[in-house]
Amino acid sequence: MLAVGAMEGTRQSAFLLSSPPLAALHSMAEMKTPLYPAAYPPLPAGPPSSSSSSSSSSSPSPPLGTHNPGGLKPPATGGLSSLGSPPQQLSAATPHGINDILSRPSMPVASGAALPSASPSGSSSSSSSSASASSASAAAAAAAAAAAAASSPAGLLAGLPRFSSLSPPPPPPGLYFSPSAAAVAAVGRYPKPLAELPGRTPIFWPGVMQSPPWRDARLACTPHQGSILLDKDGKRKHTRPTFSGQQIFALEKTFEQTKYLAGPERARLAYSLGMTESQVKVWFQNRRTKWRKKHAAEMATAKKKQDSETERLKGASENEEEDDDYNKPLDPNSDDEKITQLLKKHKSSSGGGGGLLLHASEPESSS
C-alpha cells in the first residue's frame, strides 16, 4: 500500500511539474513501474538484454553501488528519488482495474520526435528514450512535449479508435455510382418534379399504371411525346402531345356538359384517362378557344343571313305596295306624277295597250 500511495503521489506531482523534461521522465517512469509490485513475481537474475545494455552503454553510467534496474538517470530532486526503487516487473496476467487501465502506456503520438511503441520490454524503450533526451536538448524537449501529451487524458485517448454516435458511418462507394443514386442526384439538380424530367416516366396514381381495358395501348399518350427535346442549336423544343381516340372522345363528352372544370373534377378526369392535370387543363383551354371562334363565326353567318332575309322581305313588301297601287282603278283626281308613273309601268308590262285604256276612260269621264 505504501508503494501504491507513493505512485499516486508521484503521478499527481508529474502533472504539476512545470519543467517539460521532468514531466517526460516521470510519465515514462509511471509507464514502466507497475502499481502492485507484490502481485507479480520478481524476474530471475540474469544478464541484461542487448537493448538495455546498449542503451546503458550510451547513457552516462551511474555511480557504483546504486541500484538502477531501468537504466534511468537519478532524478535531481529529492522528493522523486523513490521512482527507481521498485524493481522492474513483467505482468504475468492481464489486470482490468481502473488504475491498471489508466497506467497502461498509450499509443505513439505523431509529433516532431516520435515515442517508441509500447512493447513487453518496457525497460529498453524507456532507457532508449532517456538516453536520447540526455544526448540532445532539442530532442529532449520534443520528447518531453510528446510525453506530456501522452500522459494527459487526451493523450491516453489519442491511440484509441474513435467512434462517434452522432456522425453517420461513411456510405459505401457504390452508392455514388449506382443508377438509384444518379436518380436521387438528378432530383437535386432539376427543380422540376420527376415526372417532367427528360427520359423519365411520369409518376401516375397507382391505378393508372394498370391500363384500363378500353384504352388502346398503341394510341395511348406516351410520356416521351410530351417530353422536352433539344434542337440542333441547343434550344429547348416542346413537342405537342397526341391523345388517343378514346381520350379525345371522353374529353369531348365532358366538354359538351361543362365548358369549365373545377380542380377535383380535373384531377378525377385526368386520373381516369391516364393523363396529367396540366394536359387536361391545356386541352380544355384550347377547346374553349376553338369553341369561341366557331361560335363567333356561326353568329356572324346567322347575322348575315338574317340581314339578307330582312332586305329581301323589305324589297318584297315595297313591290307589293306598288302592285296594290297598280291594281287599283285610276282616280281622275290623282296628281299628274302618279298617273305618269302608272302609265310608264303599264307600258313596260303590257306594251301598247295603255292608249286604248286611256281612250276608253276618256268618254266615260266626258259622259
From Swiss-Prot:
Chain intervals with Basic and acidic residues compositional bias:
304-317
Q: In which tissues is it expressed?
A: Pancreatic beta cells.
Q: What is this protein called?
A: Homeobox protein Nkx-6.1
| Residues the record lists as Asymmetric dimethylarginine modifications | R189
* Keywords assigned by UniProt, alphabetized: Activator, Developmental protein, DNA-binding, Homeobox, Methylation, Nucleus, Repressor, Transcription, Transcription regulation
One biological process term from GO is: cell differentiation
| Organism of this sequence | Homo sapiens
Record's compositionally biased regions (Low complexity) = 48-59, 78-91, 110-133
**What InterPro entries does the record point to?**
HD (IPR001356), HD_metazoa (IPR020479), Homeobox_CS (IPR017970), Homeobox_NK-like (IPR050394), Homeodomain-like_sf (IPR009057), HTH_motif (IPR000047)
Predominant cellular place of this UniProt entry's protein: nucleus
Q: Enumerate the residue ranges of region (Involved in DNA-binding).
A: 306-367
